[in-house]
Each structure stands twice: as C-alpha cells, then as structure tokens.
C-alpha cells in the first residue's frame, strides 16, 4: 500500500463530511423555498397557529437536533476511521523500523537484494513518519469536531427542553385562565338564574296557579248561583200553587150555596178567613229552611273568595325601595315555610357550589405571584 494512502483517506473523510454538510444546507434551503412557495393558504394558517402558540421555534430546534445528530454520527465515523488510519500508520512505520533493524544486524552478510530493500525502507521511513504525523493530526481534528458536534447537540437539546418548558407553561397558564374564566361564567350564570330567572319563573307559576284557582272559584260560584236560581224558581212555583189550591174549594162550593153569597159579601171576614189568608201568604217552612242555608252559604263563599284572592296575590314585584325592604324582611323574617327534602338538598348543594366558586375566585385574585 502506498505511503500517502492514510492521509488521503482521512482527508477524503473530511471532504465527505464537508460535502454532506453542504448537501444538508442545500436541502434545508430548498425545503424552505418550497415551504415559502407552495401551499400558501393551508400551510400559512398552520404556520400562523404555530407561531402564535410558540411551537414553530420548537419545531425548528427539533429539525436542528436531527441534523446535529446526523453530524455527530458522521464525526464519530470519521474519528473511528482516523483512529484506524493512525493505527495503520504506526504499525507500518514500526514494521519498517523492525525490518531496518534486522537488516542492520546482518549488515556484513548483505546481498544485493538486501541492499535494495534497505535503501527503499530508508527512503520510505520519512514518508511513513509524515503519514503518521498527518494521521495523528487528522485524528485530533476529527475528535475535536466530534466533541464540538456533541456539545452543540447537547446545547440544542437543552434549548429545545427550555423552549418546551416555556411553551408548556404558557399553555398551562392559558388553560388555567380558561378554566377560571369558565368557572366565572358558570358563577355568573348561576347568579343570573337565581336573581332574575328563578323569581320570574316563581311569579309565573304563582300567577298560573292563581288563575286556575280563580277559574275554579268562579266555576263553583256559577254552579252555586245556578242552584240558588233553581231553588228560587221552585219557591216561587210553590208560592203560586198554594193560593190556587186554596181557591179551588171555594169555586166548587160556590154554586151549591148561591143564596148565601150576599150574606157572605156583607159579613166581615172572621177568624177562619184570616187564617186562610195567612196560610196562603206564608211559604212552606221546609222550603224556607232549604233555601236559608243556600243563601247563607253564598255569603261565606264570597268572603272566602276575597280572602283567598288576597292571600294568593303576589307582593309588588317592582324595583322600589319598599319592595326590596319587604323582600329582605321576608328573607330574614321569622315566617315558617315548608320544604321537601329534595328542595333542601338542592339549596344546600347550590350554596356549597357558590361558596366554593367565590372562594376559588378570591384565591386566584389575591394569591401571591
């Protein structure tokens, strides 16, 4: 093998490394041109999204780390080749020196072939020494480049880790504020529902209930008035029937005693006639007793209707100070109310949720930064 083969191998390795580096640079330049020219709309939206979120720098660092890892692998391969070349140069020079020493030991018995061999070894010793020195220098350069590549790779990895930490903190902060915002919206909706929607719904239910009660009372009063009218008509029919029945015997008896008609006309009415007229004018006691409870029952119904409507009418729903004062007095008064277990549990859970939300908002606002 020629003496110049070892440094040529090392230099070819270095040239190959430089060529691969230039190839990577051309590849990245072409990739950037392609990304800038094609797919502008869709890729522009993704780039804007990643740029806003701070993830584009992380992607760039990731690509740099991949390229740096490839460079580290190449430098390690070159270091291995330089070590092999340096070992080969050392072995070749050592073998040449051993052969020279052997020839010098039998110098008195040299043949023409030994003389030519000694001459060639002596001439190549300088070249072998130069090749060994070049291989050593190439090994040092390769090791230094490998160390630089490894250090740059570590730096890139640390930079990527730092950027990812910053990005994750930013996303976590945004998610935290988003969570607090949603919680605040929920609390606001809860307060709006409790302050505005719930009273409106309650008033609507009370109004509907009052309308139904009033309709039922009016229907009942109408039925009672109809019954009273029927009973009054019955009483009037009974009152007209009694005089007709009393007058019928007199009409029948009148033709039998015609001679006494004048006498009866002239004779004043006696006690019997007064009793008869009294019986005709006075209605039946049973009918009077039947109508009296009906008439007395109508008056309590009217009174109960007025009292019920007075109780069911809602308080003034205006925004006047008197209305608010009355509402606060009702909230903190001694009035007894009846609640079901479900309503009590619902009120307790709503109060606990509202307290937790308020405490969370206060902690988020006043906690030390």
Swiss-Prot record:
Task: Indicate yes or no for the key word Coiled coil.
Answer: yes
Q: What is its main location?
A: mitochondrion
Which Pfam families does the record match to this protein? She9_MDM33
Q: Which loops or segments lie on the Mitochondrial intermembrane side of the membrane, by the record?
A: 198-345
Keywords annotated in UniProt? Coiled coil, Membrane, Mitochondrion, Mitochondrion inner membrane, Transit peptide, Transmembrane, Transmembrane helix
What superkingdom does the record give?
Answer: Eukaryota
**Record-level GO cellular component terms:** mitochondrial inner membrane
Coiled-coil positions are 128-156
- Sequence ranges on the Mitochondrial matrix membrane side: 367-369
Query: Member of which family?
Result: Belongs to the SHE9 family.
Spell out the protein name for this chain.
Sensitive to high expression protein 9 homolog, mitochondrial
């Amino acid at each position: 093998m020629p003496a110049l083969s070892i440094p040529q191998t090392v230099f070819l390795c270095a040239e190959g490394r430089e060529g691969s580096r230039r190839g990577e640079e051309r590849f990245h330049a072409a990739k950037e041109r392609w990304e800038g020219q094609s797919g502008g709309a869709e890729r522009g939206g993704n780039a804007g999204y990643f740029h806003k979120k701070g993830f584009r720098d992380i992607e760039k660092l990731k690509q740099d780390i991949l390229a740096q890892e490839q460079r580290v692998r190449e430098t390690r391969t070159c270091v291995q080749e330089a070590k092999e070349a340096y070992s080969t140069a050392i072995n070749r020079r050592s073998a040449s020196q051993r052969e020279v020493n052997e020839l010098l030991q039998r110098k008195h018995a040299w043949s023409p072939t030994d003389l030519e061999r000694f001459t060639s070894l002596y001439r190549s010793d300088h070249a072998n020494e130069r090749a060994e020195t070049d291989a050593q220098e190439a090994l040092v350069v390769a090791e230094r480049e490998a160390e630089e590549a490894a250090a740059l790779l570590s730096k890139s990895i640390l930079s990527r880790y730092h950027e990812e930490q910053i990005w994750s903190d930013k996303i976590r902060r945004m998610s935290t504020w988003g969570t607090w915002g949603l919680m605040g919206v929920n609390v606001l909706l809860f307060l709006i529902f409790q302050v505005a929607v719930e009273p409106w719904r309650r008033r609507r239910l009370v109004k509907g209930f009052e309308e139904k009660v009033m309709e039922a009372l009016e229907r009942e009063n109408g039925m009672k008035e109809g019954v009273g009218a029927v009973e009054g008509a019955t009483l009037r029919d009974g009152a007209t029937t009694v005089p007709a029945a009393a007058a019928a015997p007199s009409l029948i008896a009148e033709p039998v005693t015609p001679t006494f008609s004048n006498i009866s006309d002239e004779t004043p009415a006696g006690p019997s006639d007064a009793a008869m007229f009294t019986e005709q004018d006075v209605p039946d006691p049973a009918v009077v007793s039947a109508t009296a409870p009906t008439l007395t029952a109508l008056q309590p119904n009217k009174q109960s209707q007025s009292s019920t409507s007075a109780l069911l009418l809602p308080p003034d729903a205006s925004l006047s100070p008197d209305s608010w004062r009355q509402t606060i007095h009702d909230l903190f008064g001694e009035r007894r109310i009846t609640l079901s277990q479900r309503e009590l549990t619902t009120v307790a859970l709503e109060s606990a949720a509202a307290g937790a939300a308020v405490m969370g908002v206060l902690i988020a606002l006043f906690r030390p930064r």
